[in-house]
A protein has these predicted regions:
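Charged, alpha-helix-enriched surfaces in structured cytosolic catalytic cores
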Residues: 49-54, 58, 71, 75, ...
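Post-HEXXH active-site segment of zinc metalloproteases
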Residues: 70-101
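Pan-zinc metallopeptidase signature
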Residues: 132-199
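Peri-catalytic and regulatory segments of divalent metal-dependent proteins
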Residues: 1-72
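Short helix/loop segments within enzyme catalytic domains
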Residues: 2, 8-14, 92-160
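Hydrophobic or amphipathic, alpha-helical segments that drive membrane association/targeting
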Residues: 1-33, 102, 108, 140-141, ...
């Protein structure tokens, strides 16, 4: 883990490594949190389900959050979400707080896309980044996932559709902090195809 961590940090020119922790959790995931000094947490499930190239993308993704200063906002979002649950019985206060939380979630979904780019830059392997997103979509098991079908789903999601599709997308994403894996794959593919990844 430390070797992959230092490789990702080197690729992103991270001069001072943050602390890295492994949390016991069977789910695939990681996070970068903290206020004054951010740190990274990777789940044990991530270590079990990913190969080194995919892990480098995850760690690069979290380092991207760190480099962009996202950890402070992530921590604020977590705190405000807890507060919103506690004051939900207050009509006016909860509406205002829920509005702030909704805006932070929308911002966070955009931050996830920029962190995905950092993960791709750290990993230097678009196919590993795609496998990672497929594992996020399918729970880690790629034996039942068709790459072509997944990319078609990403393209279909990206194309959008009519007003009804837009409303469905809005409802699907309203309470999420992360875009759907297919949407993330579409954005990543667009970035790679544009040539910006190569620069």
């Amino acid at each position: 883990v430390h070797r992959v961590f230092t490789e990702a940090a080197t690729a992103l020119d991270v001069s001072e490594l943050p602390e890295l922790y492994v949390q016991y959790d069977r789910a695939l995931g990681g996070m970068c949190v903290g206020m004054a000094r951010a740190f990274i947490v990777i789940t044990s499930g991530t270590l079990e389900l990913l190969d080194d190239d995919e892990l480098r993308c995850v760690i690069g993704h979290e380092l991207g959050h760190l480099l962009s200063g996202h950890a402070v906002y992530r921590t604020m979002l977590d705190i405000l979400t807890r507060w919103a649950r506690r004051v939900s019985w207050l009509p006016v206060g909860s509406v205002v707080l829920l509005g702030v939380v909704a805006a932070l979630r929308e911002w966070w979904r955009k931050a996830e896309l920029s962190a995905d780019r950092a993960g791709l830059l750290a990993g230097q392997d678009p196919s590993a980044a795609l496998r990672l997103l497929m594992k996020l979509a399918g729970g880690g098991d790629l034996s039942e996932v068709d790459v072509t079908a997944f990319l078609e789903q990403a393209a279909e999601y990206d194309r959008g559709g009519d007003l009804r599709d837009s409303v469905i997308k809005l409802r699907m994403n309203a309470f999420r902090t992360h875009p759907l894996p297919a949407a993330r794959a579409a954005e990543m593919r667009r970035w790679v195809d544009s040539g910006a990844y190569q620069r």
